[in-house]
């Protein structure tokens, strides 16, 4: 007993240093999982050990026979010699701070709709992984005006990568980048500026319609230094609303919605680097309470690509809403086959509007340029022009219409993943139901989630159900009304537990996580990835699950739908543990009986 106590005391003494070296015990743990394709594959990030901060890109695979494997897709140390000596742009550092990202290497990724290509950066350099070919190659961005590479997003069709420099929105045509080498490939003519920050306002941010970039570059050069940004989320969105993106591809890869904002009215703070006192303090715009916020604009950019998939020009349409009354752009959603959705809020966050952005069907579509012809004298004439799309009156893109409005005299909670369309066109929104004392979901304005099941995040929306993270309020949803799988530990499924459930539009629901804890999920096809931890274990858990067909005792294939079995593949976790288990007791305190933990 004495030796055990001494060991625990040693672990407690070592805890502060160990927590710092392991980035709060996250190094070596799998994270950022996403199920792709038919669900038999799942991407995730993980470093090699408990004190290794350099994160690699991995893929979990479940075969048709139920065999499982973990495949290393991209190792920063293999791709970049100085991967350990992280050197990322200042704007990227700021974005990571808002996202509470402390790792290095590959800290985020973007995958196309089919799950075949993945884009990411390492130390500000752009890379592309072709999963089927098993090749990862660097895309060298050499021109200074095309740097830094921030927040790259691959198009849903996998043919383009869009990123922002903060000053320019840049397109990379992957058709012009070689598929035959894993060495760094010079992007060359594959890179085009498609939009830039404006000089005085946000009315003219698109690239010139004749395909040149002179005006865009000129506007950016003359803009106020650092006041206007393009393709980035403003501080309030990232820090307070958990919105970190500043541009969004359309599902058909033909459009991009992008944000521009003017931060010149915000206060300037000067942030020093405590790790390097020789560096001068950096100026950062910060929206202090009771002072002006950034002035946020949104633009719909119609993209023109030729038959080879190469960008030749774009047409910009201002997205119009009452920006004076609703200054916060809280969320953007774009479902295949439907118009993009916006959620905008007023300054006090007591009123919001759900808006549909009109994209429009042109009566004359944009066409590829005619590049050069011969005049009457037989002389070659250099030209470059594109056909500008024409729209019927009232069909011009960029106008918005209000689909729903919500009000709450106290506060409107933001529910991540809302608003969203179902594939068949029904509108799913969040609702602060004060009468039911519940954060609920509505479909076409009608609440359908149960009273007492507090919706915290929407993970996926289908025609049949909504996948979401919930907390239960026992006073509103008693144990007797819970599904069978929660009956044995009903008391622990309360405000302390973030559970994943499937809720159908008729109100029926079923839990998909059974152990009380903090959970999330990504699903695709017949597969999913569950990530989280229970209350009785400090270790992060990740499981890749997939329904596969089984065979009968003779080995013959069985086609019946009821002969499917669930394969559960645990993803390895190399993270450190604290070395001791704190003695925690939960109590209810105060007039409102709030949950508290006594350690």
Indicate residue ranges for each PLM-predicted region:
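Structural motif
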Residues: 51-58, 125-127, 167-173, 265-271, ...
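Beta-strand-rich domains and repeat architectures in extracellular enzymes and scaffolds
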Residues: 18-58, 105-114, 328-332
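Hydrophobic beta-strand positions that form the internal "hydrophobic ladder"
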Residues: 42-43, 118, 158-161, 253-256, ...
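Short loop/turn segments that connect beta-strands within beta-propeller blades
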Residues: 62-65, 130-134, 174-177, 303-306, ...
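Beta-propeller domains
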Residues: 259-456
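Non-catalytic accessory segments flanking enzyme active sites
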Residues: 32, 54-55, 107-108, 257-260, ...
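Residue-level detector of Asp-centered blade-edge/turn motifs that repeat once per structural unit
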Residues: 37-38, 113-114, 156-157, 251-252, ...
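Predominantly five- to eight-bladed beta-propeller fold
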Residues: 3, 60-108, 177-210, 214-247, ...
């Amino acid at each position: 007993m004495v030796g055990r106590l001494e060991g625990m005391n040693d672990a407690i003494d070592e805890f502060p240093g160990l927590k710092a070296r392991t980035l709060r015990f996250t190094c070596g743990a799998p994270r950022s999982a996403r199920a792709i394709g038919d669900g038999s594959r799942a991407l995730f990030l993980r470093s090699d050990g408990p004190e290794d901060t350099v994160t690699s890109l991995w893929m979990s695979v479940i075969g048709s026979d139920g065999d499982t494997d973990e495949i290393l897709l991209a190792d920063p140390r293999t791709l970049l010699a100085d991967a350990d000596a992280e050197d990322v742009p200042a704007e990227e550092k700021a974005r990571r701070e808002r996202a509470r990202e402390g790792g290095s290497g590959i800290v985020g990724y973007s995958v196309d709709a089919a799950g075949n290509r993945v884009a990411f950066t390492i130390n500000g350099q752009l890379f592309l992984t072709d999963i089927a070919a098993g090749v990862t190659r660097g895309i060298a961005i050499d021109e200074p005006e095309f740097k830094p590479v921030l927040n790259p997003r691959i198009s849903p069709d996998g043919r383009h990568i869009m990123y922002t420099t903060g000053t320019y929105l840049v397109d990379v045509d992957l058709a012009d980048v070689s598929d035959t080498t894993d060495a760094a490939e010079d992007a060359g003519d594959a890179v085009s500026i498609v939009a830039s920050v404006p000089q005085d306002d946000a009315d003219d941010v698109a690239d010139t319609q004749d395909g040149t970039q002179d005006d865009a570059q000129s506007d950016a050069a003359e803009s106020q230094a650092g006041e206007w940004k393009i393709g980035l989320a403003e501080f309030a969105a990232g820090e307070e609303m958990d919105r970190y993106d500043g541009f969004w591809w359309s599902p058909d890869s033909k459009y991009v919605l992008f944000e521009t904002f003017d931060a010149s009215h915000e206060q300037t703070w000067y942030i020093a680097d405590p790790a390097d006192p020789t560096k001068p303090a950096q100026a950062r715009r910060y929206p202090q309470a009771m002072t002006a916020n950034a002035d946020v604009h949104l633009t719909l950019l119609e993209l023109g690509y030729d038959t080879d998939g190469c960008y030749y020009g774009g047409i910009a349409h201002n997205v119009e809403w009452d920006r004076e009354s609703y200054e916060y752009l809280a969320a953007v959603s774009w479902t295949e086959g439907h118009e993009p959705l916006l959620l905008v809020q007023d300054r006090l966050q007591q009123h919001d509007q759900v808006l549909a952005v009109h994209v429009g069907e042109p009566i004359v579509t944009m066409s590829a340029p005619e590049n050069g012809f011969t005049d009457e004298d037989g002389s070659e004439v250099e030209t470059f022009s594109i056909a500008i799309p024409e729209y019927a009156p009232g069909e011009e893109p960029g106008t918005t219409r209000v689909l729903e409005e919500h009000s709450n005299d106290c506060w409107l909670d933001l529910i991540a993943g809302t608003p969203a369309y179902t594939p068949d066109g029904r509108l799913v929104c969040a609702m602060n139901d004060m009468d039911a004392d519940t954060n609920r979901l509505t479909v076409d304005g009608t609440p359908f989630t149960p009273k007492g099941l507090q919706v915290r995040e929407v993970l996926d929306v289908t025609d049949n159900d909504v996948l979401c993270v919930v907390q239960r309020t026992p006073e509103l949803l008693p144990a007797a009304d819970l599904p069978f799988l929660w009956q044995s530990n009903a008391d622990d499924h309360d405000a302390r537990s973030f559970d994943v459930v499937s809720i159908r539009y008729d109100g029926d629901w079923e839990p998909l996580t059974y152990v009380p804890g903090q959970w999330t999920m990504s699903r695709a096809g017949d597969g999913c990835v569950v990530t989280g931890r229970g209350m009785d274990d400090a270790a992060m858990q990740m499981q890749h699950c997939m329904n596969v067909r089984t065979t009968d005792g003779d080995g013959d294939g069985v086609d019946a739908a009821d002969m499917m079995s669930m394969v559960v593949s645990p993803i390895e976790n190399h993270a450190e543990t604290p070395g001791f288990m704190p003695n925690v007791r939960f109590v209810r305190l105060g007039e409102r009986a709030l949950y508290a933990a006594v350690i």
